């Protein structure tokens, strides 16, 4: 909710409609709650388990808007907590990432390969974090400004 509360009145609320992006239909509303319960129960103690959980959350797409951006942050938080790494998103090509995510419900080897090759142990590096946010918006088609150019952000 915090990420999008100033933009969408439905921010942080589980969606109440079926949604699709392009030709991909996300989890039907009638199965969404059980899908989220199953995701919550999934293990997350290894890189592979974390990515499998991330893929399932992408398929669930619990919100009407902001799923990709918020789940990439969620992914990094899980990786940081469980295995001591985060993704350096500046090393992940947009087209490769989007294609791998589109195919990931069938075969997750591509997304695992892409993300594993972009892992860094600089988990507390603010620059990597901010570049990750920039890339997250870039993946979604936003190009307005870079986080590093904002001067009024406080630690």
Model-derived features: positions:
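FIC/Doc superfamily catalytic core
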Residues: 1-155
